[in-house]
A protein has these predicted regions:
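Short active-site oxyanion
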Residues: 1, 30-33, 65-67, 101-105
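Acidic, PIN/NYN-like endoribonuclease modules and their adjacent C-terminal/linker elements
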Residues: 100-130
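Conserved glycosyltransferase catalytic-site signature
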Residues: 7, 73, 92-93
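Acidic catalytic patch
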Residues: 42, 64-85
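A generic structural signal for short hydrophobic patches within well-formed alpha-helices
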Residues: 10-11, 40, 76, 113-114
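Acidic, metal-associated active-site segment
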Residues: 43, 90-105
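Short, well-structured N-terminal submotif of metal-dependent ribonuclease cores
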Residues: 1-35, 47-58, 128-130
Length: 130
């Protein structure tokens, strides 16, 4: 089953965060993942800022083992419509539009995706539960 794991899921998995075990099953098979280039941007920027460029490039090598989806005019326009409809930021709208366009589930722990169609939402509130 193909899925799109949001940037927050990649970061949880890469840093062995508290929710990493919830994201790991979705990231186990890189070839079944869809990764829009805007997600690569977010991930590279975060890893380079928080760690270093060498590790950021290693993470990009991982994402390049997935099905990388470039930004097209059709995706940009669809993302704009979704942004207006759901009040999503630019990158979040592109990520959601990519998942919807390719008919895959978006897996995320970002609150603004909760309740949207075709989203597997992993709530952060699990962090405070025993």
């Amino acid at each position: 089953m193909e899925v799109l794991v949001d940037t927050c899921g990649w970061i949880e998995w890469l840093t062995d965060g508290i929710l990493s075990d919830r994201f790991e099953p979705f990231l186990a098979d890189l070839q079944s993942l869809i990764v829009p280039t805007c997600l690569q941007f977010e991930l590279y920027k975060w890893v380079k800022r928080e760690r270093n460029e060498t590790l950021a490039m290693e993470v990009m090598a991982l994402t390049n083992q997935t099905q990388v989806i470039p930004l097209t005019t059709a995706l940009a326009l669809y993302a704009a419509d979704l942004s207006l409809a759901h009040r999503l930021s630019f990158a979040d709208a592109l990520i959601y539009a990519t998942a919807r366009h390719y008919e895959v589930t978006l897996v995320t722990s970002d609150d603004h995706f909760a309740g949207l169609a075709d989203v597997t939402y992993i709530p952060k509130r699990l962090l405070s539960e025993p």
